[in-house]
Amino acid sequence: MWVTKLLPVLLLQHVLLHLLLLPIPYAEGQKKRRNTLHEFKKSAKTTLIKEDPLLKIKTKKMNTADQCANRCIRNKGLPFTCKAFVFDKARKRCLWFPFNSMTSGVKKEFGHEFDLYENKDYIRNCIIGKGGSYKGTVSITKSGIKCQPWNSMIPHEHSFLPSSYRGKDLQENYCRNPRGEEGGPWCFTSNPEVRYEVCDIPQCSEVECMTCNGESYRGPMDHTESGKICQRWDRQTPHRHKFLPERYPDKGFDDNYCRNPDGKPRPWCYTLDPDTPWEYCAIKMCAHSTMNDTDVPMETTECIQGQGEGYRGTINSIWNGVPCQRWDSQYPHQHDITPENFKCKDLRENFCRNPDGAESPWCFTTDPNIRVGYCSQIPKCDVSSGQDCYRGNGKNYMGNLSKTRSGLTCSMWEKNMEDLHRHIFWEPDASKLNKNYCRNPDDDAHGPWCYTGNPLIPWDYCPISRCEGDTTPTIVNLDHPVISCAKTKQLRVVNGIPTRTNVGWMVSLKYRNKHICGGSLIKESWILTARQCFPSRNKDLKDYEAWLGIHDVHGRGDEKRKQVLNVSQLVYGPEGSDLVLLKLARPAVLDDFVSTIDLPNYGCTIPEKTTCSVYGWGYTGSINSDGLLRVAHLYIMGNEKCSQYHQGKVTLNESEICAGAENIVSGPCEGDYGGPLVCEQHKMRMVLGVIVPGRGCAIPNRPGIFVRVAYYAKWIHKIILTYKIPQS
């Protein structure tokens, strides 16, 4: 260590059966290749609880949700018609149900290890095509007459018995279209004078209309305009893509519904046809194209606000003076960004515009050799400092930003007052909590924030910087400029001695079974480590594990006490903190070998020359590392002395702490990142610092600079208090 809402179904499913003999039918190929998971609506971290003891459940161990879906669709080995299932991710087990969340006597319940999948056929309120696969619960005809039960001959005799049309779900008196006839689902009526009548069930393309180009469309359409089934956004087959739900949480990437995340003329989706990567979806325009206030960009004519999507000025040349091509012209460049396709983007004449969410206004040019160019000569709008920056900790910030740093739209404060009261001990100033604007009602040291509508990220900081000249305070007598650390490889504790003391809070973070970083167990479900261990927000967490209760990094001899836990979520620290909190998929079990370590009080300081320790499995100065956990003893240095050792090139601010070895060359190195600097005060051991990349491995007379945990203690407590903990 230096150390170191309602959903559609498959198109004309009943017709597909009659197409099997056609020579090269698309539907046949699609059905063979189709992943049945596309037929289900997913509710993450949710399970169903039945209050009626007569309702049956079937369960069996299976490896994937896809396998559960296949058995549910085929009803293979099930004594009932499967309408939904839950996949237990931790135990790799399926639970199949003959009911769903709309069934009387059934309720949804949060469960961290569960994902609920409901067959869209049974919960949607719309139809695709003729509605042959509709299995919803509408039981009233278009004129308002109650339907006659299918197994009844009163008042009308008929041959449409459930036993004669197996698979058509002729249950109760629900509207159905068992023969796939024109007109859609129908039923025999309870009126002796009216034998049968169609039911008023809308097409899924009409359940929710779209405005403008459908960027805000969140409806249930899951087929393309040619009838192809959409690929799930959370799947990479048959087409690999970048639009992952976790990467774009505000784009509405639910299941396999049509969306428009990239500024195309209208909503689209990837398809299940390997030969057709994507197609547009047929969704009707709203009669009155009104948009929510949060969807409308600020219109400007003399300057650009944000990315300039609301620019409506008359600049008509790119940055180097080349004139723009008219938007309604196809010469010299052909394109589909026309006034007809983008009716609400004001594509008049040849004015610079940003219809597709690019980084700034642009246009096609009249030069055949220059297809497009940015109009970067348009100035940025002047924004008052109260809107685009904050002073102090931002408690008086009154700007109108309403998005988090991860791109999530803020939730209205009035909807979150109960949650806010849970972690503050005073009555917040409601007059400041306007709409869903970023604010700092709890005096957070790290700036304005807001609640979100995402249950996985209850709240987050907003991308607002401190105003110019209002910098982070430095520690007393520290007045030298901060120099960025040179890039180094992962750190390890060099010349540390093996330790077998009680360090049950020490964590080895593994990526594909290889140790990459250390960490500290601060709560049963939470690990504190360094951001450098997770450089990308979009890495697949299934490849990561947390090993606890071990002394040997390979687990040799530690099998009986070792706990291996999956990581379910990353929570990045405040901007510039170099910290990340890991939420475990299930809580660690505290015993003689696994324990938690205390956090310091917010803002506390530790006296100079206090002896502390760093722990890690990193590089030890030897080619043949034994893989044992090592400890190196360091002492706390003040700013002045630390700066001297760094030739005056380093100044500590309030988020940093300095510690070094007195004589022996020891300290963190490769593999120790994320590990703790542990100090003892009043017989209590605490994690005072976190190891982050330094300036080399245990360089003589070069003390290490750690992230000062005390400065971020309130943030850590706030995360633990507000983020839901997985159930054991």
UniProtKB/Swiss-Prot annotation:
Post-translational modification: The single-chain precursor undergoes proteolytic processing by TMPRSS13 resulting in an active two-chain form. The single-chain precursor undergoes proteolytic processing by HGFAC resulting in an active two-chain form.
Domain Kringle intervals: 126-204, 209-286, 303-381, 389-467
PTM-bearing positions, type Pyrrolidone carboxylic acid: Q30
CDD domains per record: KR (cd00108), PAN_APPLE (cd00129), Tryp_SPc (cd00190)
Stretches assigned to the Peptidase S1 domain: 493-721
Gene Ontology MF annotations: growth factor activity; signaling receptor binding
Disulfide linkage: C68-C94, C72-C82, C126-C204, C147-C187, C175-C199, C209-C286, C230-C269, C258-C281, C303-C381, C324-C363, C352-C375, C389-C467, C410-C450, C438-C462, C485-C604, C517-C533, C612-C679, C642-C658, C669-C697
Pfam family name, one: PAN_1
Annotated signal peptide: 1-29
Keywords (A to Z) from UniProt: Disulfide bond, Glycoprotein, Growth factor, Kringle, Pyrrolidone carboxylic acid, Repeat, Serine protease homolog, Signal
Keyword set includes RNA-binding: no
GO aspect biological process, one term: hepatocyte growth factor receptor signaling pathway
Motif (Cell attachment site): 556-558
Gene Ontology cellular component list: extracellular space
Glycosylated residues in this chain: N292, N400, N566, N653
Keyword DNA-binding: no
PAN domain sequence ranges: 35-121
Alphabetized InterPro entries for the sequence: Hepatocyte_GF (IPR027284), HGF/MST1 (IPR024174), Kringle (IPR000001), Kringle-like (IPR013806), Kringle_CS (IPR018056), Kringle_sf (IPR038178), Pan_app (IPR003609), Peptidase_S1_PA (IPR009003)
Subunit structure: Dimer of an alpha chain and a beta chain linked by a disulfide bond. Interacts with SRPX2; the interaction increases HGF mitogenic activity.
Purpose: Potent mitogen for mature parenchymal hepatocyte cells, seems to be a hepatotrophic factor, and acts as a growth factor for a broad spectrum of tissues and cell types. Activating ligand for the receptor tyrosine kinase MET by binding to it and promoting its dimerization. Activates MAPK signaling following TMPRSS13 cleavage and activation.
Sequence similarity: Belongs to the peptidase S1 family. Plasminogen subfamily.
PANTHER family with a match to the protein in the record: HEPATOCYTE GROWTH FACTOR, PLASMINOGEN-RELATED
Name this protein carries in UniProt: Hepatocyte growth factor
Native organism: Felis catus
